[in-house]
């Protein structure tokens, strides 16, 4: 569904030509606009898919693994804390915030983020755009991490409900 919606949006946007961008993308040689949805002709004629919250997901997986290894009896407590946005369990939140985090030169957390990014990129690139080219993962979230964070509940990394997601591939903590 995502690929079909993105392709429809690309065709609609294709009505608006972008000659200056097209020249920089090889359109001067081919004479084809980069937004032309019927013909390939520019060097980079792909479609992107914005990926949000990489650090939140990676940090959450690390926090869950840590909790289950160190304090398996608190698994249900974690679920309750997330459901209530940590309102009644600040100690659990502080524990989660103290777990290893992506972007702090900690191998386990950084490898978790890399594995997630690789898997997501593989899934996204398996989809084709309107010209048959693969979609590409785009981890540069232009301020949409603020908007999307508003709609995401509390997460196991200690992030509270409606707080922003991490920007692009930047660490949140």
Report the location of each language-model feature.
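Acidic, glycine-enriched catalytic cores built around paired aspartates
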Residues: 1-173
